[in-house]
């Protein structure tokens, strides 16, 4: 077989295998047997081995259908920032958006807009060089996302190669799970006794972050694209409408609806029509995206710190559904607060099944006049939290029963006390309070002890191995090995995570300890103001009131907790266990999780730059691999640059590296370098 004959057959096989991948993984409707599929794949692999010049990173032999690939999810910096969108929730706010544009441009509307479905999925960025896909990443914080290239390549409509595009190109879009695929996936998970996803967006996000791309491929993910980052100027495009058609012509899926509108009134007409059709769409849409159609106006208007001035998300109103309140259960939180939770007849609202709703407190129930057996109107507050809007009293039959508050704690039986509107269990030994306190302490935003899940916390409490969070640091491997389903490796991993949690710093510790009214922001402010736990413990009420965002009620709650002998004893035992009680310097872990390689000559001594990177939490290695986050390129770079390009590793100039450090630390490099 000649090279040209092999090339022709290889291209035929790749197209054929991709088609059957689509039939099997996305449609779940294969046309050939597994044996026939394996034969095609084997033939392709043999030809690529025989003619190595025909190998390609976008070949099916490198993707799903070959041996399993391990996704790395390394941090990756977007060449240009990915912004969020500001929101409009009604026509008046849409009109205000148009008026702001008019003032900024110095001329009156109406303006021409492109209106697009706002698909509720996961934002992604595809980066191409010379028409070849180098990597794909999630949006992350807009500047740094996670690389998910291998999993994105399981979506058959994403082009691996494109022709006639700028040399460097970023294509932005949304990965989503169609409603039908979501319902099918949840049925499968339910049958296996596994945890189901709450909504299609969560399912898409969870599926895109699977370590085994073959699992991702079976989930039926789709993608739709709508924007360019790098390459927009070079494309020569004049309007957003042209851009969407250009994306389709280049082979990118544009699966969401779009239309052109004149002025806010024109947008409103499209919005109202699409709102009526919302539930007939194959995907979840939570509104429309309105963009000025003329791209030259984008450059004039620019961006705020978080969003473009030329675009806005016009959100659909929260969906409301009728259902029945079947019963009320009472839950005890980590502070002892007792919260009534309504159990509803399950109802599908805005993409997920709602079967529980918080009823907050006694006053809320009285004001709502809700009873067990009532028909209620439910929506999702902010599109997220289920909430009872009102009671449908016209549907009452007389069989409804008033909600009775318990006099004793539903968990420990201790008599409840009432503090204003709140019923509280005062028992310090209440198992529910202990459970919630430990669960909160171990949560990701607190001390981040990932291996300490709810079931394990329950077991530790049942066995008497822990009574509070300080006891976590006294756990030994022998204690854990005595627990059901706890092997040696799991025990070692948990103990390692507990040990690592000691160094999270004062900010995370204050949030983890659950001081009254102290969330993430207030914990940060307290840590920055006082610096150490000792200084905070000595603080007067007046000093607490000087902290940013601390009001009188919050200050009093914090002060009373700090003076509580039980709290002070807990802090003492945590300190004895080695938990860090000081605030971290900003930037101390600014580059944690990133791996750097340096090539070429820098303006500073290379060892000095390496030391700086390590001091900021980064790892520095001598060789480029797929695990490399960035290659820092100086003058006269070596072969590492070619390897980085081949592997799709992002590069930074020395100046870009220092800019990254300054952004992450908030300090000039000169003050950080030793």
Curated annotation (Swiss-Prot):
Ligand binding (Zn(2+)): 409, 412, 425, 430
Temperature characteristics of this protein: Thermostable.
Disulfide bond entries: none
Any one GO cellular component localisation term in the record: cytosol
GO biological process: DNA repair; DNA replication
Entry-linked Pfam families: BRCT, DNA_ligase_aden, DNA_ligase_OB, DNA_ligase_ZBD, HHH_2, HHH_5, Nlig-Ia
Gene Ontology MF terms: DNA binding; DNA ligase (NAD+) activity; metal ion binding
Named cofactor requirement(s): Mg(2+); Mn(2+)
Gene3D superfamilies: 3.30.1490.70, 5' to 3' exonuclease, C-terminal subdomain (1.10.150.20), 6.20.10.30, BRCT domain (3.40.50.10190), DNA ligase/mRNA capping enzyme (3.30.470.30), Helix hairpin bin (1.10.287.610), Nucleic acid-binding proteins (2.40.50.140)
Domain (BRCT) ranges: 586-674
Catalysis: reaction(s): NAD(+) + (deoxyribonucleotide)n-3'-hydroxyl + 5'-phospho-(deoxyribonucleotide)m = (deoxyribonucleotide)n+m + AMP + beta-nicotinamide D-nucleotide
Enzyme nomenclature, EC number: 6.5.1.2
Active site, per annotation: 118 (n6-amp-lysine intermediate)
Binding locations of NAD(+): 34-38, 84-85, 116, 139, 174, 291, 315
Domain of life: Bacteria
Role this protein plays: DNA ligase that catalyzes the formation of phosphodiester linkages between 5'-phosphoryl and 3'-hydroxyl groups in double-stranded DNA using NAD as a coenzyme and as the energy source for the reaction. It is essential for DNA replication and repair of damaged DNA.
Family: Belongs to the NAD-dependent DNA ligase family. LigA subfamily.
PANTHER family assigned: CHROMOSOME TRANSMISSION FIDELITY FACTOR 18, DNA LIGASE
Protein name (Swiss-Prot/TrEMBL): DNA ligase
Species name: Thermus scotoductus
Underlying gene: ligA
């Amino acid at each position: 077989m000649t090279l040209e004959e092999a090339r022709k057959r290889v291209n035929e096989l790749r197209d054929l295998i991709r088609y059957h991948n689509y039939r099997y993984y996305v449609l779940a409707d294969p046309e050939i047997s597994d044996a026939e599929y394996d034969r095609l794949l084997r033939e392709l692999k043999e030809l690529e081995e025989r003619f190595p010049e025909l190998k390609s990173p976008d070949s099916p032999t490198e993707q799903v259908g070959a041996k399993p690939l391990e996704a790395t999810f390394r941090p990756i910096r977007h060449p240009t920032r990915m912004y969020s969108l500001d929101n409009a929730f009604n026509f008046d706010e849409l009109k205000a958006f148009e008026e702001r544009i008019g003032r900024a441009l110095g001329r009156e509307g109406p303006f021409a807009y492109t209106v697009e479905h706002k698909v509720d999925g996961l934002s992604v960025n595809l980066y191409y060089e010379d028409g070849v896909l180098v990597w794909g990443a999630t949006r992350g914080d807009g500047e740094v996302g996670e690389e998910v290239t291998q999993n994105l390549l399981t979506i058959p409509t994403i082009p691996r190669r494109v022709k006639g595009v700028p040399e460097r190109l970023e294509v932005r879009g949304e990965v989503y799970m169609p409603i039908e695929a979501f319902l099918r996936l949840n049925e499968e998970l339910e049958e296996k006794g596994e945890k189901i996803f709450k909504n299609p967006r969560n399912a898409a996000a969870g599926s895109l972050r699977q370590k085994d791309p073959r699992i991702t491929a079976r989930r039926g993910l789709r993608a739709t694209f709508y924007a360019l980052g790098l390459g927009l100027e070079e494309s020569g495009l004049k309007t957003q409408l042209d851009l969407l058609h250009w994306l389709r012509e280049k082979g990118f899926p544009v699966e969401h609806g779009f239309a052109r509108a004149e002025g806010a009134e024109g947008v409103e007409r499209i919005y109202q029509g699409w709102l009526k059709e919302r539930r007939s769409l194959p995907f979840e849409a939570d509104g429309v995206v309105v963009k000025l159609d003329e791209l030259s106006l984008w450059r004039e208007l620019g961006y705020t710190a978080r969003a473009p001035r030329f675009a806005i998300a016009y959100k659909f109103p929260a969906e409301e559904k009728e259902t029945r309140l079947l019963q009320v259960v009472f839950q005890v939180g980590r502070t002892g607060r007792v919260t009534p939770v309504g159990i509803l007849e399950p109802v599908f609202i805005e993409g997920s099944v709602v079967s529980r709703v918080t009823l907050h407190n006694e006053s809320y129930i009285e004001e709502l006049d809700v009873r067990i057996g009532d028909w209620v109107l439910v929506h999702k507050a902010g599109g997220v939290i289920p909430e009872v809007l009102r009671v449908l009293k016209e549907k009452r039959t007389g069989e409804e029963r008033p909600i009775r508050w318990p006099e004793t704690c539903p968990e420990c039986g201790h008599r409840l006390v009432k503090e204003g509107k709140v019923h509280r269990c005062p028992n310090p030994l209440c198992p529910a309070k202990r459970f919630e306190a430990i669960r909160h302490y171990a949560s990701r935003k607190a001390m981040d002890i990932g291996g300490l899940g709810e079931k394990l916390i329950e077991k530790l409490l049942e066995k008497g191995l822990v009574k509070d969070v300080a006891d976590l640091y006294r756990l030994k491997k022998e204690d854990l090995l005595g627990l059901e389903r706890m092997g040696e490796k799991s025990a070692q991993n948990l103990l390692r995570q507990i040990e690592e949690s000691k160094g999270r710093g004062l900010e995370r510790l204050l949030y983890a300890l659950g001081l009254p009214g102290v969330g993430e922001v207030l914990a940060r402010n307290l840590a920055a103001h006082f610096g150490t736990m000792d200084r905070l413990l000595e603080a007067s009420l007046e000093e607490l009131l000087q902290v940013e965002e601390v009001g009188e009620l919050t200050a009093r709650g914090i002060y009373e907790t700090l003076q509580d002998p039980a709290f002070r004893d807990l802090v003492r035992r945590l300190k004895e266990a080695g938990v860090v009680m000081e605030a971290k310097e900003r930037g101390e872990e600014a580059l944690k999780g990133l791996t750097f390689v340096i090539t070429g000559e820098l303006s500073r001594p290379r060892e000095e730059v390496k030391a700086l990177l390590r001091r900021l939490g980064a790892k520095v290695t001598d060789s480029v691999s797929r695990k490399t986050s960035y290659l820092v390129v100086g003058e006269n770079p070596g072969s590492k640059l070619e390897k980085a390009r081949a592997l799709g590793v992002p590069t930074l100039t020395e100046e870009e590296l220092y800019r990254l450090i300054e952004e992450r630390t908030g300090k000039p490099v000169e003050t950080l370098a030793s």
